[in-house]
Amino acid sequence: GLGYGYARELLKRGARVVLTGRTAEGVNDAVQRLTREIPDAADRVVGCVCEIADLDSVQSVWDFGVARFGSIDIWLNNAGFARTGVGFLETTAAEIELMVSANVVGSMNAAQVAIAGFRRQGSVGKLYLTLGGGGATGRVVPGMSVYSTSKRAVKYFADTLIKERKEARDDILIGTISPGVNVTEGLLREMQRVPESRRAQAMKQLNLVGEHVETTTPWIVDRILCDTRQANNITWLTTGRMLGRALSMLFGQKRDVISRYESQRGLT
């Protein structure tokens, strides 16, 4: 997924990384895979179990990172949860609660911990929150009512944080990341929930707007590392990119990100 992609690209560029996940098994697996991919990163990557909707759990990640590496310079909040592809009435109460707690409360927990931590360090710090699902722009997408609503809330929250930091005149930068639509196992599972009558059209749309983590994350990480602007929104799927793809497909250039993803992972 995106989190793994960010960690890999940061490690390639010499950073020290604390990555998190909800289970020890998942975290340990990710750390082992990263050290196999990047052998010289073995002493620069550690993992920590975290429940993003629990403030104490998020604080423990900060404390763990500082204890291991001395300080934290960048906090990239990529944790989130999505259940999409079905109408609002087909979304369960548990799914609604999880999306709101992970995406909205989780973003607030991350911001509270990171900003307070940066202030204690007395150093420049960068906090990035993740947008998506049409929530940042207000674009209405059928089957994404709760997810996009939660991301709309994150956008408003980020704007408020930015205003507060500008008034504080400190060295803490608040930014947002719009990573586009990345093809992952989770996304493909969500696509299977789309009603059969709309699935073919949804797959066609995914092939137009979708991209691979291996493509988006190097570009995003480079911009995070060189970012010096308050309120920067790092956006992968710009209007220019979208128009370019649409024109290419109009003139016969086939784009099939789903088949490429499946073939790379031996799923076909």
Describe each region flagged by the PLM.
Residues 111-112, 159:
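A short, exposed helix-loop element centered on a Lys and neighboring polar residues
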Residues 86-88, 95-97:
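Substrate-binding pocket helix/loop in short-chain dehydrogenase/reductase
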Residues 15-29:
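Conserved glycine-rich Rossmann-like NAD(P)H-binding loop of the short-chain dehydrogenase/reductase
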Residues 176, 193-252:
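C-terminal helical subdomain
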